[in-house]
Amino acid sequence: RYRTIVASDRLTLSESFRRAGWSTVCVAPANTYAWPEGDWYGFDTVYDSRNLGYAGPKFGWTTMPDQYTLTAFERLEHGRADRGPIMAELDLLSSHFPWDSIPEMIDWDAVGDGAAFAGMPERVDVPDEPRDAYRMSIEYSLTALFTYLERHGTDDTVVIYLGDHQPATTVTGPDASHDVPVTIVAKDPAVLDRIDAWQWTDGLKPAPDAPVWPMESFRDRFLTAYGPNGS
């Protein structure tokens, strides 16, 4: 299915931003080799584990902590004085299975090239129970994201964050659905007013009766809400 989609002419959300004159960036620290499909997705620039400048240790499967990924994005793209409007996809890895090595937050000013994380994978005590370890990883990942936004978000910043799939069955149990929560965060109330008709739950936790959509439907709903004819 992946080969089928990248051989198609489907318009991606990132390509839509590129056509509108935005700079489009993908930060994919899990990638350890070239990803030519990035151009099909509409990304002007792709960063991966080879060019993000990380000099610290791996955390199990994870090539670098989320706090470093966000720091590198700020240094390389978002914090540049000469940049225009930017649309970026950032893949945050620290909550990914198997949760056997989870980072801790450090002072943002100490992150540097990641050398400050030396010894942390061995030092941090991770719970043996998978659900507890998963919860710890989610707490870390969201803390990294939210504190980054507190430091570097602006009045114009809009964040859409979601998981691309549910965790392993050791956490969810055998009968879990494929549903994942998605949240839009913005300082400008007008941004959220555009999606009132979606009937999403305020806050970070969807209500039991919150609408459930296929992920592929998000593009059209988003472009309709925020396009020139959006309400």
Tell where the protein language model's regions lie, with residue ranges.
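Solvent-exposed soluble domains appended to multi-pass membrane proteins
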Residues: 1-231
